[in-house]
Amino acid sequence: MKELFLSLFTVKDLRNKFLFTLFVLFLFRVGSYLPIPGIDSVALKSYFKSQSDFSIANYFDFFSGGAFSNFSIFMLSIGPYISASIIVQLLVYSFPSLKKMQEGDGGRQKTKKYTKYLTIVAAVVQGYATSLYAKGIPGAVTIPFYRYIFVAILTVTTGTFILLWFGEQINQRGVGNGTSLIIFSGIVVRLQAALFNLFQSMQDPSQNVNPVFVILIISIFILVVILIIYEYKAQMRIAIHYARANSNNTVSSYLPIKLNPSGVLPVIFASVLITLPLQILSGFAETSSIARQILSYLRPNGFYYTFLNVILIIGFTYFYSKIQLSPKDISNNIRKNGGTIPGIKSDEMEKYLDEIMNKTLFSGSIFLSIIAIIPFLVQNIFRFPHDVSRIMGGSSLLIMVGVALDTLIHIDAYLKTQGFSHGNKKNYAFLQKI
């Protein structure tokens, strides 16, 4: 780990990229405290302070890094964009004609354009829903409501696209994946508050928090982090033999299939897909008994919420991994390059790879699901503060560890392109292990 931090400060270009990334994330944090025009911050603070840990409002606030409770310009984060991306990818996967349209640079540009159009639609819908939610907060809206709706929708939609631009700037000039780091930073800022609440609960006799349980949970937290790292690196290697030109000899290689090829994306997608309808329903909770009933069933970290989250994680693990690693495309590429899999006929290669992928994806999705239910277990068994249970496991921990590992891989790739992987192999041994 020491070598990693040294590289961030001793390699000039990498240092500049790292500092630029921190600067962009700092701008995101500043924007999280800038409220939408027409909102009374004092009324908001009083309202959110009165909300229980189990409320939908606190759930939104947790994953937005505090932007939701401030009704800030970034209160939707990049959720609308992720929702739009899911819809577009589902359509492309379902319709072969759309899949053909995506081929080539021109096709990919069209897909990006349609995704941005859908992002606007999703942001407008969510912006309208949050406007209705603000109307239900006593004294929160200080201007005529019809005017506030227009201002709020325009502001949060613009805020979402500003964050997308931030993410693109990090991709081009910074370190790591920009959109993932924005989500990551929003969760990390809640870590300090969660730990503070934990130690505060230990000192409060009415909370009845056993210090032994605290040590146990922290130990479990460390163990889970280690398991996530190992799961992230785990892979099955399939031997491949390539025939040499003008020779009877073969060259042996292998095809690595990760336990979870899509990384942290299924968890992010599942979280966003749950949040979207919850945000819309919360806007109508004041006037609709049906919306209130659905929200009560989908209480964060409740049974139905956890069950739905697990189903979505499993579904997105299979869906997104099959998009990234198509058995048909892989088998075609192996055959084109004169490769064979020992013991497998050429025309059965696709079926074999599909079976192997299904087995690895099943194990990977079950692991992610087990991690996802940890907050539910911690909250209901040990009665820990709600934000503490979210940090100790589940989607938040998977996102934090997954994005951190992805960033390390980006750093490793950059160092290799700059010639550090050979000349300074000893100094970057930690990165090589990752």
UniProtKB/Swiss-Prot annotation:
Quaternary data: Component of the Sec protein translocase complex. Heterotrimer consisting of SecY, SecE and SecG subunits. The heterotrimers can form oligomers, although 1 heterotrimer is thought to be able to translocate proteins. Interacts with the ribosome. Interacts with SecDF, and other proteins may be involved. Interacts with SecA.
Keyword Protein transport: yes
Any single biological process term in GO: intracellular protein transmembrane transport
NCBIfam families: 3a0501s007
Xref: InterPro entries: SecY, SecY/SEC61-alpha, SecY_CS, SecY_dom_sf
GO cellular component: plasma membrane
Protein purpose: The central subunit of the protein translocation channel SecYEG. Consists of two halves formed by TMs 1-5 and 6-10. These two domains form a lateral gate at the front which open onto the bilayer between TMs 2 and 7, and are clamped together by SecE at the back. The channel is closed by both a pore ring composed of hydrophobic SecY resides and a short helix (helix 2A) on the extracellular side of the membrane which forms a plug. The plug probably moves laterally to allow the channel to open. The ring and the pore may move independently.
Name of the encoding gene: secY
Subcellular locations according to the entry: Cell inner membrane
Species for this entry: Borreliella burgdorferi (strain ATCC 35210 / DSM 4680 / CIP 102532 / B31)
Name used for this protein in its record: Protein translocase subunit SecY
Transmembrane portions of the chain: 19-39, 73-93, 117-137, 148-168, 179-199, 209-229, 264-284, 300-320, 362-382, 391-411
Highest taxon, organism lineage: Bacteria
Family: Belongs to the SecY/SEC61-alpha family.
Pfam family, one: SecY
PANTHER family from the UniProt entry: SECY/SEC61-ALPHA FAMILY MEMBER
Alphabetical keyword list: Cell inner membrane, Cell membrane, Membrane, Protein transport, Translocation, Transmembrane, Transmembrane helix, Transport
Membrane topology: Multi-pass membrane protein
